[in-house]
Amino acid sequence: QAALAGLPRGVVTGGAPGRGVILDGATTTACQIVLRADFPVSASERDGARALRLEPLPTRLTWEDVPEGTWAVGGDAAAPVTLPAHTSVLVAGPPGSGRSTALRALAQAMASDPLVVDDLDLADIATATQVEAALARSEVVLASASTEKVATTFRGAISTMREREALVVLWPGMRPADQAAGISLRTVTDPRAMTLPGRGALVYRGTCLPIQIVLPRPEDNDRPIEHPV
């Protein structure tokens, strides 16, 4: 790709977020863009530079396998994923991808008491209005909807969450995931796990991270969750 762009040899800077090249017509300078403090990264990537080692994402992960407060693992190190405090999350995915399980995992990981709405795309007017009001007050909202609905809704609570908050796209290799995310998800899609329940991508402020949702702990009198729903 660098050669196709006309870049000379020796200026390839790697694929880390923010890496780039400054071209002024005479010289070529490798550079690193200063990233925002709330740029989403996995825990190990946040700890500092180290030798690159790509860890495969697990195909199944329970709350007993991860540190307290972990709702997903992701990134090159398959490490616990974090988001800035007070961030709302919209979970998009087709039936069977694990939307409801993702909401439950997110809710258990939150320090606050968020408003949780499963199937926001099927909610009545009163519920949708409640979500919009909560977002306007900067309260944390966790909601889910079908990928198709997220991709084709341009106003209301779903549109607001897609544009302003974090988006979890389950089964990112399935149509119309790219349209729902507003960016191509090809680089975070594992062709061997296209329909693995709980497999997805975290999209936040123009960046994306491959993730696997953690199966949350059972609530009182609940059976353990064996598979994402």
Which positions does each model-derived feature cover?
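Phosphate-binding and hydrolysis-coupling loops of NTP-dependent motor/remodeling domains
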Residues: Q1-H86, T152-V229
